[in-house]
Amino acid sequence: YYSPYVEEIGTDKTGLGRWSWIRIKGNNNLKTMIISAYMPCKPRKQSMLSNYAQQERYWRMRGEETCAKNKCREDLIKFILESRTKGERVILMIDGNEKMRTGALAKRLKQRDINMRDSICEKVGSKKFPTWFRGQEQIDAIWVSDELNVESATMFPFFFSIRDH
């Protein structure tokens, strides 16, 4: 592996690329799961090639008529709960494509059994800040388990590199 601290690496079991993760083991055998995730959003224009459409086809071919975004959220929550149940700390870096202060994912991550907080929002305070160049809301976040201490955080301006978030 990459470091003696890295215990395991993996991806979303569906193969859809919804998230990837790395589990590290630090001092006192404390384990932390670091997850990088993308939650699809329904495109403004009908597109067979969008990530959302691809994921909906995947589920439909398996007999599930479901919203790709809702399914991703449900599966991600289940994955995080498995880690939390094992006593692991979790860091979730996500392009959530929904409001990170008041959306369904935010509400669920704040509940007692998961107990996570948005570290960016914590550092920025109550200021409203968009995280997508065409948006008005924070749709990206770095959620951390409540027992983790975040010392600092920063955000790059839009178009700092090739990204639009």
PLM features: what roles do these ranges have?
Residues 1-113, 147-165:
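Active-site regions of metal-assisted phosphoester/phosphodiester hydrolases
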Residues 104, 129-131:
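Short secondary-structure transition/capping segments
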Residues 113-128:
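His/Asp/Glu-enriched short active-site or ligand-binding loop at hydrolase and phosphoryl-transfer sites
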Residues 132, 139:
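Conserved catalytic core of two-metal-ion nucleotidyltransferases
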Residues 141-143:
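Short glycine- and hydrophobic/aromatic-rich loop-to-beta-strand nucleating segment
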